[in-house]
Amino acid sequence: MSLTYMNMFMAFTISLLGLLLYRSHMMSSLLCLEGMMLSLFVMMTMTILNTHLTLASMIPIILLVFAACEAALGLSLLVMVSTTYGMDYVQNLNLLQC
């Protein structure tokens, strides 16, 4: 395993741990999700370039599209929650309430 792969795997693991441990604020959760998506994108791109798979060269672009959609939905949810409740605490969110 090369040093670059190990760094990207460590970045993914740290982002995952940040998502699991520090989930009190919605903004920190969204930043951890973006870090995970970015490290996945870099790892997939490096793997495809190293193995010379021309048929799979579109997969990282599709992942970036999903990451952009996830970021847009997350930010719109963050704006809605912060204007409604005045804070972005994840603990105050309950999907069963109206």
From Swiss-Prot:
Highest rank taxon of the organism: Eukaryota
Keywords: Electron transport, Membrane, Mitochondrion, Mitochondrion inner membrane, NAD, Respiratory chain, Translocase, Transmembrane, Transmembrane helix, Transport, Ubiquinone
UniProt GO molecular function: NADH dehydrogenase (ubiquinone) activity
Predominant cellular place of this UniProt entry's protein: mitochondrion
Membrane protein topology class: Multi-pass membrane protein
Compartments, as annotated in UniProt: Mitochondrion inner membrane
Pfam family, one: Oxidored_q2
InterPro entries linked: NADH_UbQ_OxRdtase_chain4L/K, NUOK/Mnh_C1-like
GO BP field: ATP synthesis coupled electron transport
EC number: 7.1.1.2
Annotated Gene Ontology cellular component terms: mitochondrial inner membrane; respiratory chain complex I
Catalytic activity: a ubiquinone + NADH + 5 H(+)(in) = a ubiquinol + NAD(+) + 4 H(+)(out)
Transmembrane stretches, start-end: 1-21, 29-49, 61-81
Function per UniProt: Core subunit of the mitochondrial membrane respiratory chain NADH dehydrogenase (Complex I) which catalyzes electron transfer from NADH through the respiratory chain, using ubiquinone as an electron acceptor. Part of the enzyme membrane arm which is embedded in the lipid bilayer and involved in proton translocation.
Subunit structure: Core subunit of respiratory chain NADH dehydrogenase (Complex I) which is composed of 45 different subunits.
Family per record: Belongs to the complex I subunit 4L family.
Name of the protein this chain belongs to: NADH-ubiquinone oxidoreductase chain 4L
Organism: Vampyrodes caraccioli
The encoding gene: MT-ND4L
